[in-house]
Amino acid sequence: MEPLIGMGVLALIGVAATIAGASEDLESDIGSQSNPNSQVQLAPQMMFPHRIFNKAISGEPPSNALMCSIGAAIATVLISEFTVSPLFALVFGSVIAASVHATFAVTATMGRCASQSRFKQPIYLDMIRSHTPAIMGYAFITTFCVLIVSYLMTVVLGHPFPLTMLAFIWGITIGAIGSSTGDVHYGAEREFQQFEFGSGLNASNSGNIVRYAESGLRNGFDNSWFCSKFGGPTTGIAFGMTVFLGSWITTIFDPAQGLSMGWLSVIAGVIIVLILIIWNWKIEVQARKAYGPYKEDKAEEASA
């Protein structure tokens, strides 16, 4: 393959991965999944009923791995056995995967809310009806973009793994990145905006999540809107960089061209990792110097 064509394919893969990362994080925000959902689950038990979609089907890595694997398996069957257009096969597989994901989401939130009836937590059917299509939409975008990445890597770049295996791996990866990157914006900031920023969360405030929005009661749409400003784009950039840089190394230094090129790809990968570690350390040090530790108010110090 010509180097320019390979770089063009990598650019397309990077764009698709960035979109997939952003939509994955926003899907977990609107449906409340992964780590922050522990506070949503705890809220009714602390006498704080809410209108937050409480699905948390599983951790994001296995949830997205299942979703992407289903879409890839269906697309593979349609392409290989029925000679269907790859684009149609990827779209159809993504629709089925999003439908399965929505089914799990509805049963999960209804089961969780029903189990908390003793704590006066209602089941808001209007909330479920309004949130489920949005969850399906985000799930479709995530699955479709991951399938595009996997298909291009398999067919164009000649990756040895089959489409379903690649989709499974990227599903785990995108779920892990969304859980560790974007969910921090939702769980550490959006859920507890009534407490002063930087003060941390006292154990006595566990479950005391924000339940009232700018107008009316807060729901998943409010959380998704807020996290689309930072958490979603950050997750998209993180996943896009992971996919692009991981494939860029072996495209520039193709191990198939010889042992020396293989070692050059390893060295390039190590250098990139070291640069990212140092960059992250610099950002953390700068943030600590700029904002410092949390300081108590003078009134609090006087009363103490």
Curated annotation (Swiss-Prot):
Pfam families in alphabetical order: MtrE
Enzyme Commission (EC) number: 7.2.1.4
Record membrane topology: Multi-pass membrane protein
GO cellular component: cytoplasm; plasma membrane; vesicle membrane
Any GO BP: methylation
Pathway where this protein functions: One-carbon metabolism; methanogenesis from CO(2); methyl-coenzyme M from 5,10-methylene-5,6,7,8-tetrahydromethanopterin: step 2/2
Catalytic activity: 5-methyl-5,6,7,8-tetrahydromethanopterin + coenzyme M + 2 Na(+)(in) = 5,6,7,8-tetrahydromethanopterin + methyl-coenzyme M + 2 Na(+)(out)
Stored InterPro entries: MeTrfase_E
Superkingdom field: Archaea
Top-rank EC class of the record's enzyme: translocase
UniProt similarity note: Belongs to the MtrE family.
UniProt-recorded name of the protein: Tetrahydromethanopterin S-methyltransferase subunit E
Organism: Methanosarcina mazei (strain ATCC BAA-159 / DSM 3647 / Goe1 / Go1 / JCM 11833 / OCM 88) (Methanosarcina frisia)
